[in-house]
């Protein structure tokens, strides 16, 4: 396979994951398709990847989250800490992630961006929608 795209990603997610997990992935892929400035698709053979990116005049292309067809998500918080000098935007993203997922994302507890199992973070549709609102809000702040 040369590169992944929306349809191959969704197909692989449906084949690889339980239905409730693939439904979350599909919701997030559709959200990215509607709202991301750029979606970056991976080139791996076994596992598909998708990265939601926001175009900022001040900071260039900023990845906000990363999905895999194995049912995992990575929040690009530490990438933002290193590449977005406006600490209030990074802090806002951190606080919203902590509020959404009841996890600690400070620099000491979360020193590098890690993959999390989607089904451990999202249990109901409202949680997915709340995360989507967070991403839209951070995207808007990056574009100011």
Q: Which residues does each predicted region cover?
A:
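Charge-biased C-terminal accessory regions appended to nucleic-acid-, cytoskeletal NTPase
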Residues: 98-144
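Polyanion-binding interface signature
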Residues: 1-116
